[in-house]
């Protein structure tokens, strides 16, 4: 349900509620001690309108739903899962390691991506035999689908802040450097990976991400992208209802 659809539904029930208040229904003799059907209906409508307004506020300013269209995050997220995404959190705190993040990628697409945050600014990453090492420590990753069968290679990229390229001395890692050797993530950048490592288009293809609203993208991409929010709950289907870790 979009905010506009929810608002239309609230307005519809509000009109019914107002109409029921214009001309009270007569109470039959001997029934003055019990609430009329009209009164009961009005109370239910009041409750629905209040709940709808609260929901409208939440989905407009705090959370949104996100539908999983692909298998890049299997087994954590299955195709057709529906998630709740906190759009409010990253306005005040930085994204954390292992967060499952929704964002617009720096490629020509109208669709959001969803990946896991593996590396943050200042982290040194190395990938060897399918194992990710962050600051010299092998990551415990029980969430991945299977051991990756490739060594990751970063694409050429430039980092843009407020539409201006960052100083190359700060922003650039040597072109197409292999992540089998340690590489330090530049300031303001994040390394995103899908849990289904062998079937995920992520940072090893299109570069780094920034929560501030820009991405470090390859020169052939030419589009900035931004974090939308932190995915925190699978709420559909009901048999998969749980908080994301």
Where do the language-model regions lie?
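Transmembrane alpha-helices and immediately adjacent membrane-cytoplasm interface residues
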Residues: 38-67
């Amino acid at each position: 349900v979009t905010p506009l659809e929810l608002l239309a539904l609230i307005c519809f029930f509000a009109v019914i509620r107002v109409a029921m208040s214009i001309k009270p229904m007569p109470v039959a003799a001997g029934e003055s001690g019990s609430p009329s059907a009209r009164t009961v209906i009005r109370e239910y409508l009041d409750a629905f309108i209040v709940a709808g307004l609260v929901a409208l506020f939440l989905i407009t300013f705090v959370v949104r739903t996100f539908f999983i269209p692909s298998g890049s995050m299997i087994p954590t997220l299955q195709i057709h899962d529906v998630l709740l995404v906190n759009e409010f959190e990253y306005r005040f705190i930085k994204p954390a390691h292992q967060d499952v993040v929704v964002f617009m990628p720096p490629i020509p697409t109208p669709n959001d991506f969803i990946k896991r945050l593996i590396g943050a600014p200042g982290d040194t990453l190395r990938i060897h035999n399918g194992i990710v090492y962050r600051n010299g420590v092998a990551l415990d990753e029980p969430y991945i689908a299977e051991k990756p069968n490739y060594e990751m290679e970063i694409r050429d990229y430039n980092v843009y802040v407020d539409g201006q390229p960052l100083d190359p001395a700060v922003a650039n890692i040597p072109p197409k450097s292999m992540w089998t050797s340690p590489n330090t993530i530049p300031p303001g950048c994040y390394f995103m990976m899908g849990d289904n490592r062998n079937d995920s288009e992520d940072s090893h293809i299109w570069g780094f991400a920034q929560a501030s609203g820009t991405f470090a993208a390859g020169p052939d991409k030419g589009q900035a992208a931004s974090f939308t929010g932190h995915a925190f709950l699978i709420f559909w289907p009901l048999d998969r209802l749980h908080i994301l870790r």
